[in-house]
């Protein structure tokens, strides 16, 4: 079955077809960097990383753009509270984001445009909307007129134009607009706020216009995929449809709208007021990054996911089994090569059928591989894919430890198992660690003096780096104390961290 993707706008799975054969233009709304990234961000960007990985594994060239909203009310408020420039707040939290995503094995997008870099393009787009009478100038800025294109209302959420509560359509102030459903395109700055010159006076962009301007700059008038969290469908993404389609006259703006589900904590929506709000840094102090990734991928990206300590502990056990299977196969290949087993046959191939046992088990793995690909082609179903991969991870050690196959066939199967796991658990799901780490999980005696300590220390240091980048000094100190208790001396230098055993 060819790839089918669920489109929020049409509310159905459709065969995936792009404007240009073999290429995908994908825009995903990025963070507003006023505070450290949290588990909701982890869910979102791991989901779109999965989509990115599968498209590339399927032969597509993906042109991936993800923005940073580096000017916003919350950033300004945080900067005022700290008495620093708003760009310092944004940059600090952008660094935190990159560090967290790297730890979670999220591949980088091709471009990360920032709002402050595209203000001229935003002003040009607002001017066009005014000229086409889709926007109007008021005493406090420029507003988009919903009444100028009522047919576009509710395209993603299905709600009626008359059903919107007052004030739902914009983050910035709402005085001066003609209709409560109108939203801000350009907001005149108050004294002391960041400001850019414009034909309507010094000010800054509204929330929604930025993404329309950035997608137009990078992809043109129409593109293939627009993604983001479920909460962005309204007002943000519906506002983008208004702005972009009214500006360019082209419809639809996007071929496929893709939205990921929410993250709940122990059955409740994650929120600071409920005290169940986790930053990624806080989560990685307690759980390995790939364990967290494993847990988040064990749900379809459109489904809500209820994170709990029980779920994360279960993911820890499942991920350990996966890594151990990978390590086991790697160890067998390495030991076979050292023992002089040469010309290890490349599976699958016809002459292996002389071993009925191996042929039957090989058939099971090939079937799982096919089923995993079918699941990914069914709207990127990572839950089903992960289930197939874990079935393989249970099967691989059983075959490698079997007495029914000889040394050469065992080596051949181990090599096939490594490639099998690397294809889906690694390239597609992004769940495999470095080879030496996996081998040590299976056989710690590979480096009895320092291997286990070295891996644990490096994992702790990586978590400490994340905490330090987010200025989470308490977590960083806790990790340093844990290292000290292990007899590890940590020294921070301009060239990086140096550690030694006391």
Can you describe what each PLM-predicted range is?
Residues 1-34, 49, 63, 120-332:
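Alpha-helical recognition segments enriched in aromatics with Gly/Pro capping
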Residues 10-15, 19-107, 492-499:
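N-terminal, positively charged nucleic-acid-binding surface of large information/translation enzymes
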Residues 60, 134, 488:
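Short phosphate-binding/catalytic loops that engage adenosine nucleotides
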Residues 68-73, 94-97, 107-122, 140-148:
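Short, glycine/charge-rich beta-strand/loop segments that flank catalytic centers
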Residues 80-86, 110-116, 229-230:
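The substrate-binding groove and active-site-proximal loops of carbohydrate-active enzymes
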Residues 269, 279-502:
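Structural preference for alpha-helix termini/caps and helix-kink/transition segments
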């Amino acid at each position: 079955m060819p790839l089918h993707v669920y489109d929020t706008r049409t509310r159905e799975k459709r065969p995936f077809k792009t404007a240009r054969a073999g290429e995908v233009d994908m825009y995903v709304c990025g963070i507003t960097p006023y505070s450290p990234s949290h588990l909701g961000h982890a869910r979102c960007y791991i989901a779109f990383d999965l989509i990115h990985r599968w498209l590339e594994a399927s032969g597509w060239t993906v042109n991936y753009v993800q923005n940073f909203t580096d000017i916003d009310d919350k950033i300004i408020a945080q900067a005022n509270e700290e008495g620093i420039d708003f760009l310092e707040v944004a940059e600090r939290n952008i660094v935190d984001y990159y560090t967290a995503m790297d730890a979670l094995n999220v591949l980088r997008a091709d471009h990360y445009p920032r709002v402050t870099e595209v203000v001229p393009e935003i002003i040009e787009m607002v001017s066009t909307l005014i000229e086409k009478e889709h926007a109007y100038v008021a005493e406090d800025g420029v507003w988009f007129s919903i009444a100028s294109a009522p047919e576009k209302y509710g395209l993603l959420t299905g709600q009626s134009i008359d059903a919107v509560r007052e004030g739902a359509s914009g983050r910035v102030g709402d005085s001066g607009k003609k209709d409560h459903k109108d939203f801000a395109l350009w907001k005149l700055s108050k004294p002391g706020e960041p400001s850019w010159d414009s034909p309507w006076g010094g000010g800054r962009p509204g929330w929604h216009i930025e993404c329309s301007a950035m997608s137009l700059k990078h992809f043109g008038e129409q593109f293939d995929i627009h993604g983001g969290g479920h909460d962005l469908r309204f007002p943000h993404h519906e506002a983008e449809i208004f702005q972009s389609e009214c500006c360019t006259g082209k419809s639809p703006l996007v071929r496929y709208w893709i939205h990921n589900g929410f993250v709940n904590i122990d059955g409740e929506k994650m929120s600071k007021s409920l005290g169940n709000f986790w930053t990624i840094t806080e989560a990685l102090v307690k759980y390995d990054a790939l364990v967290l990734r494993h847990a988040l991928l064990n749900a379809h990206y459109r489904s809500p996911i209820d994170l709990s300590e029980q779920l994360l502990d279960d993911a820890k056990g499942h991920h350990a089994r996966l890594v151990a299977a990978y390590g086991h196969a790697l160890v067998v290949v390495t030991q076979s090569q050292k023992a002089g087993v040469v010309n290890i046959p490349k599976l699958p191939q016809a002459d292996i059928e002389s071993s009925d046992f191996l042929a039957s088990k090989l058939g099971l793995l090939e079937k799982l591989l096919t089923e995993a690909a079918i699941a990914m082609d069914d709207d990127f179903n990572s839950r089903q894919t992960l289930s197939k991969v874990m079935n393989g991870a249970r099967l691989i050690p059983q075959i490698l430890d079997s007495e029914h196959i000889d040394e050469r066939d065992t080596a051949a199967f181990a090599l096939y198992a490594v490639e099998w796991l690397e294809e889906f658990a690694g390239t597609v799901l992004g769940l495999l660690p470095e080879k030496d780490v996996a081998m040590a999980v299976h056989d710690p005696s590979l480096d009895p003096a320092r291997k286990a300590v070295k891996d644990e220390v490096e994992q702790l240091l990586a978590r400490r780096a994340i905490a330090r980048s987010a200025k989470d000094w308490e977590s960083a100190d806790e990790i340093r104390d844990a290292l000290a208790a292990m007899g590890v001396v940590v020294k921070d230098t301009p060239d990086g961290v140096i550690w030694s055993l006391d």
